[in-house]
Amino acid sequence: MHYRDQSLGELAITIPRATALFREFNLDFCCGGKQTLLRAATKRALDIDMLESRLADLSTQPSTEKDWQQASLGEMIVHIISRFHDRHRAQLPELIRMAEKVERVHHDKPGCPIGLTDQLTLIHDDLTQHMMKEERILFPMIQSGMGTQAGGPISVMEHEHDDAGQQLDVIKSLTNDVTPPDNACTTWRALYTGINEFIDDLMEHIHLENNQLFPRALRGE
C-alpha cells in the first residue's frame, strides 16, 4: 500500500505504532500532522520507499493500544488530563531541577546545555497556562456538546501547540538532539532520559488533540 500521499496525522491515527517510527526519524506528526509523508520525508532527505515499507510492516501487527476513534470525546478528555496534563505537571519541575544542577556543576565542560534551565522554565510556564485554558474553557465546551462552536478556542490551542513544537526544537538544539556526552554524570543522563520521555509524551498529547479530539469536536460528534 502507498502511504506517501497520506498525512502524518492520518497515519498516526490508523497505524498507532507509526508514532514511534516518526519519532525515530524526527518527523513531526503532531504540530506538522497535516503534511504528507512524502513531503515530510523529502524535507528531511529520507528514503520514502523505506518509510512506506516500515509502515506496511507496522500495519500488519496487532495493536493492543486503545482505539481513540471509537472512544467518546468525554472519555478522551479524561484520558488527556490524567495521562498527559497531570504527567507534564510532575515532569517539568523535576527536569528544571536537574537542568539547573547540570548547568551549575558542569558549566565549563564541553556539551553543557547552557540555557536549558531557562528554556524548560519557559515551557513549564507556557504549558501550565495552556493546560489551564483547556481544562477551564475548551474541554467544558466540548463536554457540554458545544464543540461545533469551539472553533476560536481550538484555533488558539493549535497555535500554542505550534509554539510548543518550536520550543522542543530549541531543547533539541541545546542538548545535541538530547544526546549526553560520553562522560556525562548520572544526573546529566537522567535529565536527558527525562527530556526524551517528556518529548514523547508531549508529541503524543498534541497528536491526540490536534488530529483526533479537535476535529471530532468541530464535527459535532
From Swiss-Prot:
Keywords: Cytoplasm, Iron, Metal-binding, Stress response. Its main location: cytoplasm. Di-iron-containing protein involved in the repair of iron-sulfur clusters damaged by oxidative and nitrosative stress conditions. Belongs to the RIC family. YtfE subfamily. The gene is ytfE. HAMAP family: RIC_YtfE (MF_01606). Disulfide bonds: none annotated. The keyword Cytoplasm applies. Homodimer. It is found in: Cytoplasm. Pfam families: Hemerythrin (PF01814), ScdA_N (PF04405). GO terms for biological process: protein repair; response to nitrosative stress; response to oxidative stress. This is Iron-sulfur cluster repair protein YtfE. Gene3D superfamilies: nmb1532 protein domain like. One of its GO terms (molecular function) is metal ion binding. GO terms for cellular component: cytoplasm.
